[in-house]
């Protein structure tokens, strides 16, 4: 697993499969999430790169290459859902893109990848890398999942939502996995990270991350201005494709006392049972046996 910030993409192209082919999924791969990621290597990368992440400007972020095997991601792309009712299209002055958040429609390989990044080992990796503890993955992929931007598409600079209203969680981390074979920089689509609005504040700082195949971008949110402003100029039949995950923390509940080390039982006790137990603690068993025999003797009279 490489942790470099930049790498050249493989020298061959990959076009989107035809809609009709996307339905011909193979059987589910013989993999489980724990086999998809090298968890030992994950923790090594987190330990080695945590300072880089936290010190990065304009806000904490990193780009890591080679997090998955290339053939695994190729298979995921081959199983892309058809660009029909399975995709939600957004065409506004702020964005032009398609999204699909239902992992059951992704195909078996991408679904396993989704589960791998929602698993405990990957969450522990994120916590070690970012320094943010108590991270919670979102199995519902609210506003996450596949995002596809076709020629002419774009995503204006924006701040992400701060709270997942259904689960009442605070959004903390974005993870983007790019799936673009042989991507050319002149096509555009680089992820822009900004410190301030470049229009209203000339002092802003900008970092760009190319959306190369098998590259993962991770950054803090929601106070992170990001996007890709310029319309894509990639060839027809190509698109800027990525999978995304969001991670949250739970806000403290007012009035709740922390009880993390033991279960605290409350409620009525059986007085008779409690009295017998207490008596047993201070009375030798032989006394109880003698009392029983005396009681039986008097009962026979």
Regions found by a protein language model. Name each.
Residues 2-50:
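N- or domain-start disorder-to-order transition segments that initiate the globular core
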Residues 86, 91-92, 96-103, 129-138, ...:
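A structural signal for the main folded, soluble domain(s) of proteins
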Residues 61, 158, 226:
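Histidine-centered active-site/metal-ligand motif
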Residues 78-81, 105, 114-171, 180-182, ...:
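Non-heme Fe(II) oxygenase catalytic core, chiefly the N-lobe of the double-stranded beta-helix
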Residues 174-176:
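Eukaryotic charged/polar low-complexity linker/IDR segments
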Residues 41, 50-130:
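Non-heme Fe(II)/2-oxoglutarate
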Residues 69, 73, 110, 119-123, ...:
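A structural signal for well-ordered alpha-helical scaffolds and beta->alpha junctions
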Residues 2-5, 152, 166-171, 181-301:
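Catalytic core of Fe(II)/2-oxoglutarate
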């Amino acid at each position: 697993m490489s942790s470099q910030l930049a790498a050249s993409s493989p020298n061959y192209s990959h076009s989107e499969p035809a809609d009709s082919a996307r339905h011909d999924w193979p059987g589910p791969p013989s993999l489980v999430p724990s086999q998809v990621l090298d968890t030992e290597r994950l923790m090594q990368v987190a330990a080695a790169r945590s300072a880089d992440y936290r010190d990065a400007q304009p806000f904490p972020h990193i780009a890591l290459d080679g997090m998955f095997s290339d053939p695994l991601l190729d298979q995921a792309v081959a199983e892309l859902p058809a660009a029909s009712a399975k995709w939600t299209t957004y065409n506004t002055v702020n964005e032009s893109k398609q999204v699909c958040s239902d992992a059951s429609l992704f195909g078996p390989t991408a679904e396993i990848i989704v589960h791998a990044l929602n698993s405990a080992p990957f969450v522990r990796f994120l916590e070690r890398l970012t320094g943010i503890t108590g991270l919670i993955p979102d199995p519902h992929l609210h506003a996450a999942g596949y995002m596809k931007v076709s020629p002419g598409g774009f995503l204006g600079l924006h701040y992400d939502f701060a709270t997942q209203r259904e689960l009442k969680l605070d959004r903390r981390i974005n993870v983007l996995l790019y799936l673009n074979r042989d991507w050319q920089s002149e096509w555009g689509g680089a992820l822009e990270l900004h410190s301030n609005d470049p229009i209203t504040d000339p002092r802003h700082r900008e970092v760009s991350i190319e959306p190369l195949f098998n590259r993962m971008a991770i950054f803090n949110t929601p106070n992170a201005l990001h996007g890709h402003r310029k319309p894509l100029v990639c060839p027809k039949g190509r698109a800027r494709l990525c999978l995304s995950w969001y991670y949250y923390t739970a806000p403290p509940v007012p009035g709740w006392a922390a009880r993390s080390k033991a279960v605290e039982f409350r409620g009525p006790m059986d007085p008779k049972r409690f009295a017998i137990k207490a008596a047993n603690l201070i009375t030798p068993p032989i006394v109880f046996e003698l009392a029983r025999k005396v009681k039986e003797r008097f009962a026979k009279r």
